């Protein structure tokens, strides 16, 4: 399938069983041991239509010095393994994000790339993180920025879910979610490596993105410690009314919830706030009036 394919999407409907796996990061763990542990965690999830892992669970979200050394390509054995996991689980599998290089790009280019596999194990979508965290250091200094929002149609026997992909720091930028909501997104999946020190932002912003776009939000965070940064955990699944369907604490955990898109459609019909967007104004540049006097 062409990952860049553009076509009209069917409306979201039905019910989707989701599992978000909150992973504990251990910087002393060998990469092969971490991969094996992830396999055990996902195998223990049980039946689900969509399984989600956190951002950079393989590399470490704050392990900047090892990113380049441990970067992988989409042809890596890691992705072959993840494809097999999706096929074995017969589930959509958002395998989190990875430091990815591409043969056709400049040698210095590396992206924080999320990957989504379908139940047959086929790679159905990738998303390069658009907003890089770290200001003048961290991600802006080390990796390239993505520039393409990504929406994918998840199909199961019971549901169709128009799903937007984003990553961690993207959560702070509501314009991304409003932009993809115009494509009909009813679910936003957000893997992260969010620190404990700003965990109240993580929780509040997730609910805000759900409320303002009347969409489900699945936030899958890391826990543990990475380069002396205490990771926040508190993964959560939120409905389109801002109500929390499931929430973790700081322990490694699997969150589960059933997303009812028929109920979401009823919410959107009974309170059609999205119909009142003024895209004509926001698309026009130079129209803001600066008032110098009352």
Curated annotation (Swiss-Prot):
Residues 16-261 form the CN hydrolase domain. GO terms for biological process: nicotine catabolic process. It catalyses: 2-oxoglutaramate + H2O = 2-oxoglutarate + NH4(+). SUPFAM superfamilies: Carbon-nitrogen hydrolase. Keywords: Hydrolase, Plasmid. The active site is at residues 55, 129, 168. It comes from the Bacteria. It holds the Pfam family CN_hydrolase. One of its GO terms (molecular function) is 2-oxoglutaramate amidase activity. InterPro entries: C-N_Hydrolase, C-N_Hydrolase_sf, UPF0012_CS. It is an enzyme of class 3 (hydrolase). Pathway: Alkaloid degradation; nicotine degradation. Its EC number is 3.5.1.111. Catalyzes the conversion of 2-oxoglutaramate to 2-oxoglutarate. Together with glutamate dehydrogenase, may form a physiologically relevant enzyme couple, leading to transformation of metabolically inert 2-oxoglutaramate derived from trihydroxypyridine into glutamate, a central compound of nitrogen metabolism. Belongs to the carbon-nitrogen hydrolase superfamily. NIT1/NIT2 family. This is 2-oxoglutaramate amidase. It comes from Paenarthrobacter nicotinovorans.
């Amino acid at each position: 399938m062409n990952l860049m394919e553009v076509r009209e999407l069917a409306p979201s409907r039905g019910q989707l069983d989701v599992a978000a796996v909150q992973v504990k990061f251990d910087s002393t763990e060998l990469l092969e041991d971490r991969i094996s542990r992830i396999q055990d965690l996902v195998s223990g999830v049980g039946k689900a239509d969509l399984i989600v892992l956190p951002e950079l669970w393989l590399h470490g979200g704050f392990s900047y010095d090892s990113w380049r050394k441990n970067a992988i390509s989409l042809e890596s054995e890691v992705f072959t393994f993840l494809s097999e996991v999706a096929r074995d689980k017969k589930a959509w599998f958002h395998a989190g994000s990875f430091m990815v290089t591409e043969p056709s790009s400049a040698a210095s280019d590396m992206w924080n790339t999320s990957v989504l596999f379908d139940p047959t194990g086929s790679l159905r979508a990738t998303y390069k993180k658009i907003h890089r965290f770290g200001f003048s250091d961290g991600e802006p200094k080390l990796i390239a920025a993505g520039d393409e929002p990504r929406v994918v149609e998840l199909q199961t026997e019971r549901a169709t879910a128009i799903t937007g992909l984003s990553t961690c720091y993207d959560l702070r930028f509501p314009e991304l979610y409003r932009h993809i909501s115009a494509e009909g997104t009813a679910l936003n999946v957000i893997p992260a490596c969010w620190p404990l020190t700003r965990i109240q932002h993580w929780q509040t912003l997730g609910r805000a993105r759900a409320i303002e776009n009347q969409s489900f939000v699945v936030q899958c965070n890391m826990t543990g410690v990475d380069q002396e940064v205490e990771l926040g955990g508190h993964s959560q699944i939120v409905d389109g009314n801002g109500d929390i369907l499931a929430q973790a604490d700081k322990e490694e955990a699997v969150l589960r919830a059933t997303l009812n898109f028929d109920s979401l459609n009823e919410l959107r019909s009974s309170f059609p706030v999205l119909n009142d967007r003024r895209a004509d104004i926001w698309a026009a540049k130079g129209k803001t009036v600066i008032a110098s006097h009352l």
